[in-house]
Amino acid sequence: IESGNPDVSGYANKIKTHHNDVELVRKARERGLIIETNWDWHKDEVRKVARMLGLDEEIASRQPFPGPGLGVRLLCSDGPAPLPADDRLAAFDSFVENIADGKYFVRVAPINSVGVQGDNRSYKSLATLFPKNPTALRDTDWAEIFAIARAIPNEFDFINGVAYCIDAGDNDTTAPFTCAGMHIGSDVAGILREVDAAVTKNVMNPKIAQCFAVMFPMTATAPQKYSFAIRAVCTSDFMTAKSAVPGVDFTIDALERTVSEIRAAEDANVSMIFYDVTGKPPATVEWE
């Protein structure tokens, strides 16, 4: 459905491309050159069959991995993405101030992320949420944060994702964000591999369907260049998903270890660390 395959639905829009449903494959399918005995299986059904076949749980519960690999988790950029008009930003700030009860403030990041809104693919701004008085992660009111994260995209159509800052580093988070250029290369790929390993090692468990790290070139006043987001979701079929809740779906200790290991990553140049608190929809599982 998300590939917009007309054989599945005459009304579905393309949300993302799947490697087994590109135009070349569709033409081969029309010519009878492809046999797909399990073409309509969802990931949870694939895992169920794997267990029925007696495969090791490590294989049966393996995370999905995008065809382009970590490349879709490196948010490449030639510079900052345009922000919404000032009047829209003012309304946005006022709305969040009201629903956050003065405990949080929100910034629209100069980067775009992929989402799904109204059965269509969206490429819109990311909202970053900051505590006015930072506390230890174990004292964080996650229920309140998730409620704010649900409200923002429902009210503002230029937002399709919300990430909560769990470690601001040396940044003055009220200062303007800067977004330098970043392109895929062995240097940034090596950094992301190390950070992603820390995330999956600590956060992944049987409750979580997928977790990973996202790297993007954004900072405020700190000299470090890169920020990272932790993404962990709970879902059975990946058509919809909820963001895993720290302290419920995985332990706060695991999140604290992850933050410490990201900070310690060699040459990672870490500015800020965020936790993605957005469900699907309005976001997708991946950021790109």
Give the ranges of each region predicted by the language model.
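ATP/NTP-dependent adenylation/nucleotidyl-transfer catalytic domains that generate, transfer
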Residues: 1-288
